[in-house]
Amino acid sequence: MMAERFSALQAVAGPVSRETFDGLVAFEGEFRKWSARINLTAPSTLPHLWERHILDSAQLIRIAPAARRWLDLGSGGGFPGAVIAILMKEHAPAQVDLVESNRKKAAFLQTSLASLKAPCVVHPQRIEDCYGKIPPPEVITARALAPLPVLFGLAEPWMKAGARALLHKGRDYRREVEESCDAWGFNLLEHNNEVGGDGVILEISDLRRL
């Protein structure tokens, strides 16, 4: 079972050490324990936590393998931000900033990631309150946070400084892209979701207001 999981992780994220794999397994265990007390994710997804959330998050490393500064907006239970932070332990110096306004979820992230010595900072604040406080990242991530036009508004201050965004989106992503074009200009690359399903990962760069 563990060997299969390790192989699946390397298939989506590239070469990963056994120590990093063990860190992700430990995070999964903490996630399940905390989920019994606070709502970190939909209960229906817990049986498939490794595939549906951890591997789905880890695949972003393959798209931006050289990035060392990441910013995860609306981190929730830690996907993809916490997974990226654990993977970044192999790539020092690195830092992942996770922004989560829900205090209970932020406490989970702070506690679990500190125990794993992940190179990250958890910001228990609203995204808008972090402008000017978080150094410009190379990559911005967000998963199940908001429609594209809203995400662009939230990410604009960092993207103006040169960051690109990797955004998980579902089957209706084309409608969101079209709706965004009324107010925003941007470069777009579509990446297949290697974990399955009919979603995509959108790579956005050169974001600008029209």
Q: Which residues fall in each region the model found?
A:
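Short glycine-rich anion-binding loops that position phosphate/pyrophosphate groups of nucleotides
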Residues: 76, 144-147, 171-173
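Conserved beta-strand signature within the Rossmann-like core of class I S-adenosyl-L-methionine
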Residues: 162-172
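Glycine-rich, phosphate-binding/catalytic loops in enzymes
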Residues: 80, 157-159, 184
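Conserved SAM/SAH cofactor-binding pocket of Class I
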Residues: 58-142, 152
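Conserved beta-strand segments of alpha/beta enzyme cores
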Residues: 95, 119-121, 164, 185-189
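A short glycine-rich, Lys/Arg-flanked "PGG" loop and its adjoining helix->strand segment in the class I
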Residues: 152-164
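Active-site capping/gating segments
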Residues: 170-210
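Class I SAM-dependent transferase core
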Residues: 1-67, 71, 104-118
